[in-house]
Amino acid sequence: MFKPFALVLLILAVSQLQATEPIKLPVPAEWRVENTSYPPPWAQTLPWKGTIQLRFPKSFFDSDSDYFWSYPILYQLRGDVITNTKELKRALLEYDAGLYGNKYPKENIKITLRTRPADQRYPMIIDDGFDPFTTNKQPRTSIVYHRRYEKQTDTTTILLLRSSQPYDPENDVWKTLRTLFRSHAGF
């Protein structure tokens, strides 16, 4: 009787340890990695704490590439946070405005939540922002938003799949972003 009970306890302990392990996004060949604390240095006014992971394809800065401004961002934040539209818009606006520096006025950034979700499930966001790195123009990016709160670890996990390509589930860029990163983040 003792052995089955001990086995159950061991399984529970191991599964609890696995649940507390932070998620690590994969790094495809030739993609650039950025892992940092949250809020990032350019958006210190944001109140939430945790980490972010970004993965950039080799052609991220090539305005002629389909992968221009196409990348995932994984947030792992402490607490049940960014729970509503107002907080989500604030997080995106402060992040983008800080990223653009003084090159583009914050009030010109437009963030719109679409009424029709991506893949009939995930909220879609349209971000009319700015490219401070390559073109100094205002590309429109589509963002597929994934969020969950894990009570056991008191962690909010958010995955943003972002691209300058209009969202189309048959588009190769969107297929790549979904295939490489969605399941690794647990969505």
Question: Where would I find each of the regions flagged by the language model?
Answer:
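C-terminal segment of classical bacterial N-terminal signal peptides
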Residues: V14-Q18
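N-terminal "mature-domain start" segment
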Residues: A19-F56
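Secretory pathway targeting signatures of secreted, lumenal, and periplasmic proteins
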Residues: A43-N84
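Short, cysteine-centered beta-strand-loop-beta hairpins and adjacent loop/turn segments enriched
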Residues: S63-D66, D131-T141, T153, D168-P169
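Short, solvent-exposed recognition patches
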Residues: N84-K106
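Signature of long, low-cysteine stretches enriched in small and polar/charged residues
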Residues: G98-R148
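Surface-exposed amphipathic alpha-helical segments
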Residues: T153-F187
